[in-house]
Every structure is written in structure tokens, then in C-alpha cells.
Amino acid sequence: MAPAVKAGMKRRHVEDVEPAEDFTNVYGSHYATQDMPCDDIPDDSMPPEVAYRMIKDELSLDNNPKLNLASFVSTYMEKEAEDLMLEAMSKNFIDFEEYPQTAEIHHRCANMIANLFHAPKDIGIGSSSVGSSEAIMLAVLAMKRRWKQQRQQQGKPADNPNIVMSSAVQVCWEKAARYFEIEEKYVNCTRTRFVIDPKEAVELCDENTIGIVAILGTTYTGAYEDVKAISDLLVEKKSDVPIHVDAASGGFVAPFVVPDLEWDFRVERVVSINVSGHKYGLVYPGVGWVVWRSSEYLPKDLIFNINYLGAEQTSFTLNFSKGASQVIGQYYQLIRLGKAGYRHIMCNLTKTADYLTDELRKLGFVIMSEGHGKSLPLVAFRFAGKEEGETEEKEFDEFALAHYLRSRGWVIPAYTMAPETGQMKMMRIVVREDFSRSRCELLIKDIKLCSQLLEKDSEQLIMRLKQHIGQHTSGSGKIRDPMGAAKAVFKNESHSLQGKTGKSHAVC
């Protein structure tokens, strides 16, 4: 029973209570009862603790990065590395005159990575980028320009360049070809081969081919494509077509786990390599690196000599201003860990991936990744089908399992494989530095649980959960998406591999 109101006292309603402007608790201020600014910059300022708390609360709805096993991107660095990067946040990397030691650290990183990839001593050249996508754009530009110059010197037309690559390439390769007007020639995967076929790749080459792309760690299954076999066939044919190695994921794995594997500048026809520092280079995003065998493969007319803020500098980038933090973070990891540290970490990740592979195989999944150091530390798998002797068709697929795992907090993607694989569906778990054996055990239990739930649940229930999670991951729907109009217009595009074949653009 509610207490009676004393005589002379006024009953106060919620609407009558005005939030105190000087209230020390964020949630006692009027900001807690208002929507966050969405379209227009607010007229008035707000206290820093309020802005911080409101944004932090919104970000808590994001997935936990440690449970995001879709991405190769690093989610752990030591506090000392984080402190160095925080202290350098205000430095603009491009200001060489003002920050000469930062430039020196960049050069050290580029040299270390070039030497790791066995670039010829003192003539290999390299540069940082904001990630492998920019590095790939730069490498493609260099290959195209060099091919064009050779054609012009021979008095031949140079208006129809093409590039040969596997249909399992990451979408940035499609972008590079499209943006720079280069014809894409694909070597399609099959249901039993998920990498490029060296012989077919070389046969696709003609006088207009600017280069062949070989992937050291494919996006889907983590497989290492046979760079040396491609090179040997080119040499045998006396073809001068160069090879670029996309080592975005594998460039910091293979040298430490399988050091005898020849994929880098030890291979005759390899002229350039890209690698992501923010993947198995163990740095927070975003930093990448691109290295050329020598200046011969980087045409001079792509290089800009700039006098910027009083300093002469050589530039070959798509970006200009960028933070110095990631380069400093990369240098910390290289000298802190050394080759021994990287070797221990990469071998541990490989062991964890192999253990996870064995456990998933016991649960009846078909394993698509090679493992045992012969590929990236990831596990690619799918449900068994008719090819494996299954007689009954399941009411659910890999996408349904991915949605059920999302309800447990795990972000594990499902994909439709590359063209010519019969719309094969698969899932991929990336084993990163902070994915311990104990966390691996918890994941295995949840995969087993979700698989059992899928067996019991109806098709309608599975579909409702998919729709629910799809709406949750696409945001509240209240805010106008600046790219919304473009999405509506280009939703059914048919110029990409995804639009043409249904292949999923995999998370990198």
C-alpha cells in the first residue's frame, strides 16, 4: 500500500522533475533523455564525460572483437605498444621534416620486411600503406605502367591490358582492375581445387597481360598458391609476364612456419609483394606494406619528388596525410618479438588451428583447409553433403549455423565459394594471436550446441532468427544511411564476381 501524502506536500510527477545541469552523474543530466545527434552538428557543446559515456554506451552494442573470428585483423597488442602508438597519434606521418625519426623508423620497417622476403640486397624498395588494398593498388599501377611503357617502346598498342588471377581473390583485386581499366582473366576454382591452377594461369597470358597474381593464403581456405610452379612455367615458355604475390595474410606466417617454402623474391618471376601489418604482422589496423624486387619494376613517372614543409621526399602513395602510430606499432612488434617471437606465435596458432580442425572433424564437418603449416592458421569447413554419403538433405545450411553462433556472441562467417564450385557453402574460423586453447574449447562446445539446436528447430524458427539477427546487425533503421541511395540503385549489380556468380566477398 502506497504511503499517504502528508498535508501541505505536493505530489510530484516525473514530468515535473528537471534534470540538474550540474549533476555529476551522466545519467542524471538532460542528455540521458535525448537522442544522440545524428544528422546535424548540435548547436551547443556537451561536457566531455557525457560525450564519452554516451558514445561508449552505443559502442557496447558492437560485437566483442575477441569473439570476431571472421577477421584476420589484429585485436591484441601489448600495453607498451599501445602507449607508443597513443603518444604518436598526433603525428602526421608524411611530415618527414618535422618527424625525421618517425621517417627513419618507417625505413627500418620497410628494409626488415624486404629482407624477410629475400629481396636483393640494397636494391629492393618498399613503402608503407594504410593496408593491403592500397598496397595492391600501387603494385597494379606499377605493373600496368611498366607494361604500357614496354608496348609503346615496341610501337604496339597499349589500350587493352589484362591481369590473370584466381577467382578466389579478395574483392580489392576486382576493384583495382575495374578502377584502372584492366581486363580480369580468372582461373576458376573447382569443388576440389580452391587455388589457382598454375598451368591454366600461364595459358591465359598473352601479350597484353600485365601480370599474374598468386595468393599466399587465400581468403576462403587459407591455402598457399604455388608461386614457384607459376614462375617455372613462365620461364619454360620464355614469357616475361611478372608475378605479384598477394601475401596480405601469409606474409608474416609462411616465413616462420614453413621457411623453406619458396614464394617470395627467391622465385625468379616475382617482382612485387604486398603484406598486411595489421593481420599476422600483429599491429592494430591499418598498416600494410608493398615491396618491389628493385626500382626497375617501379616506373619513375609514378614517383613524385615533393618539397613538403621544407623537406625533399619521394612519394608513391594513393594517400598523403596519415597517422604515424601504426608504423611505430609495426616497428615495436618487429624488434620486440624478433624472428623467434613471431615463430613461436605463428606455430602456436597453427597448433590451435590443427586442434580445432580435429575437433570439428569429429563433429562430422568436412574440412576444406589444409592445415599443419601448409596454409594459414584458419579452419574452413562445411556440412557433409551427398558427396560424403549423406542421404537426407538438411533443413538448414552453414548460414543458419553462423546465425545461431551469433546468438552466442561468436562472429563466424558463412560464405558462398568462388565460381565453378556449384554454389558450395562454407564457414571459416580465423585463429588469431589472442585465440587461446581455452577459448577454442568454448567455441567447440557452442558449435556442438548450435548444431544440435538446428537439428531440433523448425525451418520457420531458423528463418525468424536469421531475420532478427540481420535487422540487429544492420543498425536501428532510424538513421539515414549516407550510402543508402547507392545501395538501392546498385543492389543488383552484375559487374563483380559476387554479382555474376553469387560468390561471397569474404571478410579480410
What is the role of each PLM region?
Residues 1-111, 115-120, 141, 147, ...:
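Non-catalytic terminal extensions of PLP-dependent enzymes
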Residues 13, 17-24, 130-304, 309-312, ...:
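Conserved PLP-enzyme active-site core in the AAT-like
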Residues 37, 70-73, 93-97, 122-130, ...:
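A short glycine/serine-rich beta->alpha loop
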Residues 106-113, 169-174, 197-205, 319-326, ...:
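Structured alpha-helical segments in the cores of large, soluble enzyme domains
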Residues 90-97, 120-127, 158-160, 184-189, ...:
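Glycine- and acidic
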